[in-house]
Amino acid sequence: DDLVIGKGSALGTTPALSIDENLVSTFGATAIGKLSTDTTNTGNVELDFTAAQNFLLTFTGNVTLTNPSTENVGQSGFLIIIQDGTGSRTLSLGTDYESPSGAGITLSTAANSVDVVPYVVKAANSIQLGTPQLAFS
């Protein structure tokens, strides 16, 4: 049987979400991943993948993303990384984070610069980071 969650005066008049017998979900509108905003990041930072899908981090010092324990296989999203007014903050990665060619991630260093890094969780303890998009203005 299908599960239909509707909006309106009668069930199903405007389907908002339906899940069929094969567990295929269909949304009647845009599904928006939650954004976690943290404006003071320095030192070791562990992302909470159960609390949010996307992360906005302002670096106030050098940051190491430590290995999380909350990631879900198949989860994807992005990191928005903002340098503070000083800039030149660096990013180091725990072993669960994997970057293209294993080279790590190089961010923009100018004060107040904004970079975007996509990610997808490939498997337990394996978070694939995409190539950063640098220096948004």
Summary of predicted features, one role per range:
Residues 1-28, 135-136:
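Beta-strand-rich receptor-binding modules of extracellular spikes/adhesins
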Residues 2, 16, 24, 44, ...:
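Detector for repetitive beta-architecture
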Residues 3-4, 22, 40, 50, ...:
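Intrinsically disordered, low-complexity regions of eukaryotic proteins
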Residues 6-13, 58-137:
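Acidic, glycine/polar-enriched metal-coordinating patches/loops
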Residues 8, 23, 35, 42, ...:
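N-terminal cationic leader/targeting segments used for protein routing and processing
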Residues 14-15, 27, 40-43, 61, ...:
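N-terminal compositionally biased, intrinsically disordered segments and leader/signal-like regions
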Residues 26-51:
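Extracellular beta-solenoid/beta-roll
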